[in-house]
Amino acid sequence: MKRKKSVGVYHTVLKDGTPSYRASITFEGKHISLGSFSEEKEAAFVYKEAYKILHSNSFSLSSYKENMHIPYEKFVCLINFRDKGMYISNPIYLEKKYFTYHLEPGLFLKFDIEDLFYYSSHKIMKRGSHLFVADYGSQLSILQRYGIKSYAVEGRDYHFVNDDPTDFRYENIVILNRYHGVRQFAEKGFIKYKTVIHVRSNYVVGKYNSEAEAAIAYNKAADILIKNGIKKNFQMNYVEDLSPSQYADIYMKLKVSPKLFRVRADHA
């Protein structure tokens, strides 16, 4: 007697001859792949769960259980498709003016709706506390999309307005220090900028009234140290909104700590 095939499951064979079972489902005219599995029984379970999710409003984003067979990412995709009528292959759920990107049960990130196209085609990965995407073959921290440097420290270089480190909507992120070696601080009620450069230990280059001056001071300090024989690949600051002549004028007039001129390779 011929064994009955499982609904929504298709048997295939991999290049090495290993059997594989693909599960898929069609909903609202959309054919959705649910994944490939090594056992037909597992693929059948995934199809059944997908069918229930799509045809029952009793399932919500918080309904996922560890003993479910369907992968969590696919679970989110189906909930969003059922509720919003838009299928997105990444685990995204659309809200009115923003969307959430779900990394695991109970952990999701918020983004502005204008970032939907990017995150629909770029998968977010998590390693420890580091969140990144694969972009053109390299790992790109999601903070870099806001102009936040890889060495930036939360609370010192940037902060979240509502104290929620999972809320990446633009209005919630304030960048305090955009440039390498520059730190913002308050002095007598005024915002100032301190420039620090590291050669074995930290050297204070100076304190400045503007962020641009502080950034250029870092570059000037690096030039002095390199001229003194310090062999280090200093990460220079690119200062926006300044013409070459404006940059040169500020560079020449800026005062830096005299100590920098005494730092030599044999003393560093």
Regions found by a protein language model. Name each.
Residues 1-268:
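Boundary-flanking segments of nucleic-acid-binding domains in nuclear regulatory proteins
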